[in-house]
Amino acid sequence: MKVGIGFSDARNAEDAVLEAFLNAVNVSGEPAMTFLFTTDSYDQEAIYRTLMPRIGKGRLGGFCGGGIIGRSAVHIQGVGICTLSGDEIKVATSLQKNLSSDPEGAGRRAGEALLASGMESGTVFVFPDGFSTDVPEMI
């Protein structure tokens, strides 16, 4: 497995996501999984539109928050990307709605979607929205 990490605090959303992605993918190669972390100071649609064509067949997961905690600072503006690549990496993703109103249902639907991928074991990352309080019920 190869891992690439990239970060940018460029003012423009498209420039920031491109810089972060290129720094990450130059180390990892074509990603099977891309983790995207952004701050709320950016146009999230522009970030998404810019990034999606570049991840190829890989999957995307992540979230937007008020800051990104780095090794030496907390960044109130930035885009962080972690890319994972390797022939042995298999990725499935599931995006669920209504976590707050139906946490058990959201968890069940996510589990069913992940099981339908055919993978028998793996690691699950959960990125709920910041306003959800029922994450334990979902899990």
Language model features: what each stretch is:
Residues 1-139:
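Cofactor- and metal-binding active-site motifs of prokaryotic enzymes
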